[in-house]
């Protein structure tokens, strides 16, 4: 076991090679945008520095960044002996993914005269892409090596950028909060990967695939950070003014309604009426996922609350009934239950977005219609029903790319070259980390065993 999981050559090799390649590509392809470059900014905007996009976008970026590194990281620390890996590997793949995403998204969206322009908006978008990778990470948590995760990130970020380009640039979809591009894509990509990586003997580590009191408390820290900052996440790249304001408000009320639904149904599905911490940690966030696409639209506060309530309901029911079915019948071993937090609520959000877009009119939006649906300003033949149709097509495209991409990635990750943990050592930090106290515990265990053997001989 020790030899097969030894990463002394594998991990340094892939980390160093990837970072060297990234540095070279950044040196050749990347430059500051007009709001970041000293010469361009001071030439074009010599009056008021407060008009720089930094002051409009950075507060949202800061919140999103905390969600990626603190929220997602702590949320996955629920496993009793996998806290180092949950936080550490989250840190590793996020740091890589945001760099690779800058290049991939820039290639499709931000090329200017052969250069990729970066600034605070591109940083937010890179974090969004990273979020999709971390969602997929949740499906394979505890069963993969960091080398596998980096390879998965390379492929997923690339396909994320392709899917995002098709949805936003070709189909003209609205998806500022990422119900489709982030949550649905990340969830079904990860579910397909974990299906291909199915471990028939994972029961050998079943006792470690659970939480203890303090690990659930740590995970709840992640939940609270995500819950508080989700309005910033959904509104981060929306248009300034009323669309951004409306998105934050819709997310705010959706999350609140979702939380009450989560507590209610968590108690309802338990024969003794007790709450399940897994439901509270995860399903309470589903409202933020489900309102991501329609958040900037005139969904109304009560509409947002209905969406949040539905999201919390299907998420709890998914954890209670669907996850066990998927594992036993479909052989999908979804460690974090991403299908319930991101998959189904993401699809719900896409459907809500399509319906809300199809019902849009100037009677409701006034001149604000052109700010939410940008193509309406340039096309006199624009139709809300057609827009709703393209939103629905975008969901189908996302599911197709995610499932096919996850299938290919899963088979690549099955190659026996990554130092993956054996079935008996899944969900265990000590496979890849120096864990304080492990050597002492092992020494004490040997002493006790020796003492017992001596006592048996003497008797």
UniProtKB/Swiss-Prot annotation:
Q: Does the keyword Transmembrane apply?
A: yes
GO annotation, cellular component aspect: basolateral plasma membrane; cytoplasmic vesicle membrane; plasma membrane
Q: Which GO terms describe its molecular function?
A: ammonium channel activity
GO biological process terms on file: ammonium homeostasis; ammonium transmembrane transport
Q: Does the keyword Iron apply?
A: no
Q: Which UniProt keywords apply?
A: Ammonia transport, Cell membrane, Cytoplasmic vesicle, Glycoprotein, Membrane, Transmembrane, Transmembrane helix, Transport
Q: Which Gene3D superfamilies match?
A: Ammonium transporter AmtB like domains (1.10.3430.10)
Q: Which domain of life is it from?
A: Eukaryota
Q: Which stretches are Extracellular in the membrane topology? A: 32-58, 109-121, 171-176, 238-248, 296, 362-392
Q: Which residues cross the membrane?
A: 11-31, 59-79, 88-108, 122-142, 150-170, 177-197, 217-237, 249-269, 275-295, 297-317, 341-361, 393-413
Where is the protein situated, by its record's location annotation?
A: Basolateral cell membrane; Cytoplasmic vesicle membrane
- Family statement drawn from the similarity comment of this UniProt entry: Belongs to the ammonium transporter (TC 2.A.49) family. Rh subfamily.
Q: What is this protein called?
A: Ammonium transporter Rh type B
Q: Source species, please?
A: Danio rerio (Zebrafish)
Gene encoding the protein: rhbg
């Amino acid at each position: 076991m020790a030899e097969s999981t030894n990463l002394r050559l594998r991990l340094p090799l892939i980390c160093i090679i990837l970072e060297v390649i990234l540095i070279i590509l950044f040196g050749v392809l990347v430059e500051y945008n007009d709001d970041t470059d000293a010469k361009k900014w001071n030439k074009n905007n010599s009056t008021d520095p407060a008009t720089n996009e930094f002051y409009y976008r950075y507060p949202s970026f800061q919140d999103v960044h905390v969600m990626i590194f603190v929220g997602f990281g702590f949320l996955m620390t629920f496993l009793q002996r996998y806290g180092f890996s949950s936080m550490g590997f989250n840190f590793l793949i996020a740091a890589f993914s945001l760099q690779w995403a800058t290049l991939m998204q820039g290639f499709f969206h931000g090329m200017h005269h052969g250069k990729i322009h970066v600034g605070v908006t591109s940083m937010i978008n890179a974090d969004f892409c990273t979020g999709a990778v971390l969602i997929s990470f949740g499906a394979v948590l505890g069963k993969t090596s960091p080398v596998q995760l980096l390879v998965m990130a390379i492929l997923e970020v690339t396909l994320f950028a392709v899917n995002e380009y098709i949805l936003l640039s070709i189909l003209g979809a609205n998806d500022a909060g990422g119900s489709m591009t982030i949550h649905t894509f990340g969830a079904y990509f990860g579910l397909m990967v974990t299906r291909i990586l199915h471990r028939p003997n994972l029961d050998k580590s079943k006792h470690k695939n659970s939480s203890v009191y303090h690990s659930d408390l740590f995970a709840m820290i992640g939940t609270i950070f995500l819950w508080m900052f989700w309005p910033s996440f959904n509104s981060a790249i929306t248009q300034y003014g009323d669309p951004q304001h409306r998105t934050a408000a819709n997310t705010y009320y959706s999350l609140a309604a979702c939380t009450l639904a989560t507590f209610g149904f968590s108690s309802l599905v338990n024969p003794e009426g007790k709450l399940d911490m897994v439901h509270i940690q995860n399903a309470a966030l589903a409202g933020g996922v489900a309102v991501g696409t329609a958040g900037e639209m005139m969904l109304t506060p009560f509409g947002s609350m209905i969406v949040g309530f539905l999201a919390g309901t299907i998420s709890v029911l998914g954890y209670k009934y669907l996850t066990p079915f998927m594992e036993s019948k479909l052989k999908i071993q979804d460690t974090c239950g991403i299908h319930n937090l991101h998959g189904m609520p993401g699809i719900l959000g896409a459907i809500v977005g399509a319906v809300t877009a199809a019902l849009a009119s100037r009677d409701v939006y006034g001149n604000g219609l052109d700010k939410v649906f940008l193509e309406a300003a340039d096309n006199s033949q624009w139709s809300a029903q057609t827009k709703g149709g393209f939103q629905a097509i975008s969901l189908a495209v996302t599911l197709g790319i995610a499932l096919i991409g996850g299938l290919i990635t899963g088979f690549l990750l099955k190659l026996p070259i990554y130092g993956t943990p054996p079935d008996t050592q899944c969900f265990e930090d000590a496979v890849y980390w120096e864990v304080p106290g492990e050597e002492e515990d092992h020494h004490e265990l040997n002493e006790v065993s020796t003492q017992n053997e001596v006592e048996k001989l003497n008797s």
